[in-house]
Curated annotation (Swiss-Prot):
Gene name of the encoded protein: MED6
Subcellular location as annotated: Nucleus
Annotated stretches, region: Disordered: 193-231, 296-353
Protein name, per record: Mediator of RNA polymerase II transcription subunit 6
Comp. bias intervals (Polar residues): 197-212, 297-307
Function, in words: Component of the Mediator complex, a coactivator involved in the regulated transcription of nearly all RNA polymerase II-dependent genes. Mediator functions as a bridge to convey information from gene-specific regulatory proteins to the basal RNA polymerase II transcription machinery. Mediator is recruited to promoters by direct interactions with regulatory proteins and serves as a scaffold for the assembly of a functional preinitiation complex with RNA polymerase II and the general transcription factors.
UniProt keywords, alphabetically: Activator, Nucleus, Transcription, Transcription regulation
An MF annotation (GO) of this entry: transcription coregulator activity
Assigned protein family: Belongs to the Mediator complex subunit 6 family.
Organism this protein belongs to: Coccidioides immitis (strain RS) (Valley fever fungus)
Database matches in InterPro entries: Mediator_Med6, Mediator_Med6_sf
Top-level taxon in the UniProt lineage: Eukaryota
């Protein structure tokens, strides 16, 4: 039975109950290699096939195929590709049972798992007449099913392929979630602005409430609408709490940076590009001392009943009339004089008539 060239041998499981029935109904040490020779894992150009074919046509070689010990002993005298049994469960069980009986224990049942190796044998004169054996593959026979053991390269390669495939899927999924902004940089979470104006915040909350407002349920089922309203309120509260936390952190940052700075006592005057310093009339300490003295004097005047005027600048400003206004008021005639002149003119007019 030849395997398909497109299917790897590591993915094939072969069994043949017909051959098991032809070989006595069960597998043992003397027929396991001949049962394996019927599988697609067997190489017809190996020394096993050559020795079996010679024994069928040469009676002198027939004893070599009657037992597995004689067959493998003959293979060791040949060079080339061969298949041998590396693990015999029947022999192992027999040795274990003999030891158990010697210890007075109950014997155990055999595992019925065979291990067959494919190897290349070469003569080596440099090794003192010993053979150079290179293992090419390993096979397992469990019951009547034959499996090929995967190589180390195959196992590591498949594990690496699985790891790389999983990482590729994760990166492709995460790349769609990555966002970038000049303020926050790269992030996988949605950005929330640091500060929003009250009007914008009100408009945003109104838009969110409009978008999340459920339509009237004509069937009378209000469970869906209540859950939608609860979700909308929870989302709004979470956004508000996050914004408050950001504002508080920004306030602490500004306090730490500019908490020890104050506005200059000497103000600036002018336009941008031509600012000049204006001389203050009095420093803050002097203004405070003058204000304190004025307040104390006013309290003393109230107690004594005197009409001493409050110093200018300490209390309310005094209404002082300028000198120019005084001169004009002195030159102006009184109102009574104007009235008398008018009466005299009226009398003179009546007499002339």
């Amino acid at each position: 039975m030849e395997p398909s060239p497109d299917v790897p041998l590591e993915e094939i499981t072969w069994h043949s109950p017909q051959h098991v029935q032809m070989m006595g109904g069960f597998l043992h040490s003397n027929n396991i290699l001949f049962y394996f020779a019927e599988s697609p894992f067997f190489d017809p150009t190996s020394n096993n096939a050559s020795l079996a074919l010679q024994a069928m046509h040469n009676e002198n070689l027939r004893p070599f195929i009657e037992t597995r010990g004689a067959f493998e002993g003959r293979l060791k005298t040949m060079q080339g590709l061969e298949f041998i049994v590396a693990h015999d469960p029947l022999l192992e069980a027999a040795a274990a049972n003999a030891a158990a009986v010697a210890r007075g224990e109950q014997p155990k049942e055999a595992s019925n798992v065979w291990v067959i190796r494919k190897q290349m044998r070469r003569r080596s004169a440099a090794m003192g007449g010993q053979d150079d054996v290179q293992v090419l593959a390993t096979y397992f026979v469990v019951g009547d099913s034959v499996f090929m053991a995967p190589s180390v390269w195959s196992v590591v390669g498949r594990r690496m392929l699985s790891t790389v495939t999983s990482l590729t899927k994760v990166l492709s999924t995460a790349s769609a979630l990555l966002t970038f902004s000049p303020s926050y940089g790269h992030s996988y979470l949605p950005h929330v602005p640091k500060s929003l104006e009250p009007t914008q915040l009100g408009q945003q909350s109104a838009q969110q409430s409009k978008e999340t407002t459920p339509m009237p349920d004509m069937s009378g089922d209000k469970t869906t609408s209540r859950s939608a309203l609860a979700d909308a309120s929870t989302t709004t509260l979470n956004a508000s709490a996050l914004q408050d936390a950001r504002d508080f952190a920004e306030t602490l940052n500004l306090l730490a940076r500019y908490g020890n700075e104050y506005i200059d006592e000497t103000p600036l005057a002018g336009e941008p590009g031509s600012f000049i310093f204006t001389k203050a009339s009095a420093s803050a300490a002097e203004q405070l001392s003058v204000a304190g003295a004025g307040a104390q004097a006013s309290r003393q005047n109230i107690r004594s009943g005197a009409t001493t005027p409050v110093p200018f600048g300490a209390g309310r400003p005094a209404s002082v009339q300028p000198d120019s206004t005084k001169g004009k008021a002195a030159d102006r005639p009184p109102a009574a004089t104007k009235d008398k002149g008018k009466k005299r003119k009226s009398k003179i007019g009546s007499m002339s008539q």
